From Swiss-Prot:
Function: The beta subunit is responsible for the synthesis of L-tryptophan from indole and L-serine.
One GO MF term attached to the UniProt entry: tryptophan synthase activity
Enzyme Commission designation: 4.2.1.20
Entry protein name: Tryptophan synthase beta chain 2
Alphabetized CDD domains for the sequence: Trp-synth_B (cd06446)
NCBIfam families: PRK12391.1 (NF009057), trpB_rel (TIGR01415)
InterPro entries on file: Trp_synth_b-like (IPR006316), Trp_synth_b_CS (IPR006653), Trp_synth_beta (IPR006654), Trp_synth_beta/beta-like (IPR023026), TrpB-like_PALP (IPR001926), TrpB-like_PALP_sf (IPR036052)
Cofactor(s), names only, from the UniProt record: pyridoxal 5'-phosphate
Reactions the enzyme catalyzes: (1S,2R)-1-C-(indol-3-yl)glycerol 3-phosphate + L-serine = D-glyceraldehyde 3-phosphate + L-tryptophan + H2O
Keyword Signal attributed: no
Pathway: Amino-acid biosynthesis; L-tryptophan biosynthesis; L-tryptophan from chorismate: step 5/5
Length: 442
């Protein structure tokens, strides 16, 4: 069972949650003064239109016609499936649906914002985009967006993933991007971390610092971000807006689930449904799933913190493990992040979104069952959502209740096979830090 929308149903507007939040979002702070950040200072880092969108209180932002046309070419609208084989394997009365973002040409949801960011940069006359990537899905998406729109792209990829997922590098190079393992010797912050540990596995926080440092050396370059900030999450809401139309062919969901690193794929599916809850028009539950190795939602603190490891970004009020926290090298490289989207942090604080955390072995076990029943090998990041959906379906089975579960399968795992090999061979390690030293000063 699946629902497929025609191209005419590609959303014409992105949904901006800012005007609907239960409390005003705390302003980002200038890292030099600790005063609210002046938007003008962000223009040296981001494309101008993206800064405007970040600050906008308009509930909807029009999607440019050119972006919608490319959305059609790269696989939007994406299909929504019912996981009937998984339901039977679990013996659950719950009905499980998933939105499959792996159907895009780059294999994940990341292309939704990559195209938007590249479009606005090109329109401004920017020549080069620089970014970070964890597992490589975001770097892949931006590399293709740059190729399609005539922009050079440079990617700093967390070293652990650079080594675990070598074919991600190949795809990015095919799309014309430069790619470097992070930490690298190309930046001051990279050299600092390499001096501390020549084999440093890196992480998203370090890669972000390197990308920003790189951008600040070139007037014709701008930084593109794959998650966390509101304009990124807003671009992803095409997922949930499509899913709302597709679920009309089936039934209303009771619970909506997604994995979380910075929060963009979760927000992409959930925020259009959250809007209906905040307006009092519907009742849904929302479950955000993170790894126990990077538990910013379940064990972090809600404080102002840098978005990167080097302290280059504005300080944002968010759930954080501390910007100097070293995230262990789990195979879900896209979830190896110390912080969280500020908008999602607010929703968690108000009890609208419930966070849960899992070890990577139990996540891979859920992914294994999903692959055997539904035929799709999920990205390790997306497998966290599968684990959350399975646990919820088994809870419904124990309690003898029917329930409709919708989750975001945010990407495929065809280039993540080293993690699956380690899982099958019993070599996968679980990480659950007892203490977070980076929080000692918070």
């Amino acid at each position: 069972m699946k629902a497929v929308l025609p191209d005419s149903k590609i959303p014409k507007r992105w949904y901006n949650i800012l005007p609907d939040l239960p409390e005003p979002l705390a302003p980002p702070l200038d890292p030099e003064t600790d005063e609210p950040m002046e938007p003008e200072k962000l223009l040296r880092i981001f494309a101008e239109e993206l800064v405007k969108q970040e600050m906008s209180t308009d509930r909807y932002i029009e999607i440019p016609k050119e972006v919608r046309e490319i959305y059609s070419k790269i696989g939007r609208p994406t299909p929504l499936f019912r996981a009937t084989n998984l339901e039977r394997a679990l013996g659950t009365p719950a009905r499980i649906y998933f939105k499959y973002e792996g159907a895009t040409v780059t294999g994940s949801h990341k292309i939704n914002t990559a195209l938007a960011q590249a479009y606005y940069a090109k329109r401004q006359g920017i020549e080069r985009l620089v970014t970070e990537t964890g597992a490589g899905q975001w770097g892949t998406a931006l590399s293709l967006a740059g190729a399609l729109l005539g922009l050079n792209v440079r990617v700093y990829m967390a070293r652990a993933s650079y080594q675990q997922k070598p074919y991600r590098k190949t795809i990015m190079r095919l799309y014309g991007a430069e790619i470097y393992p992070s930490p690298s010797d190309r930046t001051e912050i990279g050299r600092k971390f390499l001096a501390e540990d020549p084999n440093h596995p890196g992480g998203l926080g370090i890669a972000i610092s390197e990308a920003i440092e790189d951008v600040l050396r070139d007037e014709k370059a701008r930084y593109a971000l794959g998650s966390v900030l509101n304009h990124v999450l807003m671009h992803q809401t095409v997922i949930g807006l499509e899913a709302q139309e597709q679920m009309k062919e089936f039934e209303e969901p009771d619970v909506i689930i997604g994995c979380v690193g910075g929060g963009s794929n979760f927000a992409g599916l959930a925020y259009p449904f959250v809007r209906d809850v905040l307006k009092g028009e519907a009742e849904y539950e929302f479950i955000a799933v993170e790894p126990k190795a990077a538990p910013s939602m379940t064990r972090g603190v809600y404080k102002y913190d840098y978005g990167d490891s080097g302290g280059y970004t504005p300080k944002m009020k968010m759930h954080t493990l501390g910007h100097t926290y070293y995230v262990p090298p789990i195979h879900a490289g896209g979830l190896r992040y110390h912080g969280l989207a500020p908008t999602l942090s607010v929703l968690i604080n108000h009890g609208i979104v419930k966070p849960v955390a899992y070890h990577q072995n139990e996540v891979f076990q859920a992914a294994h069952l999903f692959a055997k029943t539904e035929g799709i090998v999920p990205a390790p990041e997306s497998a966290h959502a599968i684990k959350g959906a399975i646990d919820r379906a088994l809870e419904a089975k124990r309690e003898g209740r029917e329930e409709v579960i919708l989750f975001n399968l945010s990407g495929h795992g065809f280039l993540d096979l080293k993690g699956y090999e380690d899982y099958l061979d019993g070599k996968l390690e679980d990480y659950e830090p007892e203490h977070f030293p980076a929080l000692d000063n918070y």
